[in-house]
Amino acid sequence: MKALYPGSFDPLTFGHLDLIQRGSDLFGEVLIAVLENPSKKATFSCKRRIEQIENATKDIPGCRTIAFKGLTVDCARENNADLILRGLRAMSDFEYELQVAHTNRSLNNQYETIFLATETHHSFLSSSVVKEVARFGGEIRHMVPEFIAKDLMKLNTN
């Protein structure tokens, strides 16, 4: 089975990587779809985020990374995905993700959204938290892969 894992991944965190690994174990194939959203100012370009993800997932079998614009269900259909994979950190995530899952089903009822709870030690992680800690010079190497930490440090020293 092929799971579509959509997101901005700006930047990719160890929480994302955990979900990708578990998705690979469960479904065999994970298509990581990096959203190109021109109305949102990204920290890293879509191209750089794809490079970061490809580097971080090179040892996880069945992973592929693409860019996408538009609706998640259209991306799933165009790439022959069987399901949509999403992670949940807290109840607040569930409320939002359930709304998105229902919207996706209303647009194309072929796609189920499968939710995986994050590992407890990753439950505080979000890309926004990582960027905020990095902005103030805090330690982030326990939150993101080393090369992403270096990318963020470069941005914050310029």
Swiss-Prot record:
| Domain of life from the UniProt record | Bacteria
Looking at the UniProt record, the site noted as Transition state stabilizer sits at 16
| Signal peptide range | none
Family listed: Belongs to the bacterial CoaD family.
What GO biological process term is on the record, naming one? Answer: coenzyme A biosynthetic process
Mind telling me which Pfam families this protein's record contains? CTP_transf_like (PF01467)
- Positions contributing to ATP binding: 8-9, 16, 87-89, 97, 122-128
Its subcellular locations are: Cytoplasm
Residues engaged in binding substrate: 8, 40, 72, 86
- Its pathway? Cofactor biosynthesis; coenzyme A biosynthesis; CoA from (R)-pantothenate: step 4/5
* InterPro entries named in the record: Cyt_trans-like, PPAT, Rossmann-like_a/b/a_fold
Q: Show the catalytic activity.
A: (R)-4'-phosphopantetheine + ATP + H(+) = 3'-dephospho-CoA + diphosphate
- Subunit structure comment from the entry: Homohexamer.
Cite the GO molecular-function annotations of the record: ATP binding; pantetheine-phosphate adenylyltransferase activity
Q: Which gene encodes it?
A: coaD
The cofactor required is: Mg(2+)
Query: What is the role of the protein in this entry?
Result: Reversibly transfers an adenylyl group from ATP to 4'-phosphopantetheine, yielding dephospho-CoA (dPCoA) and pyrophosphate.
Q: What is this protein called?
A: Phosphopantetheine adenylyltransferase
The entry's cellular-component GO terms read: cytoplasm
* CDD domains linked to this entry: PPAT (cd02163)
- Key word Cytoplasm present: yes
Q: Which enzyme class? A: transferase
Organism equals Prochlorococcus marinus (strain NATL1A)
Listed A to Z, the keywords are: ATP-binding, Coenzyme A biosynthesis, Cytoplasm, Magnesium, Nucleotide-binding, Nucleotidyltransferase, Transferase
Its Enzyme Commission number? 2.7.7.3
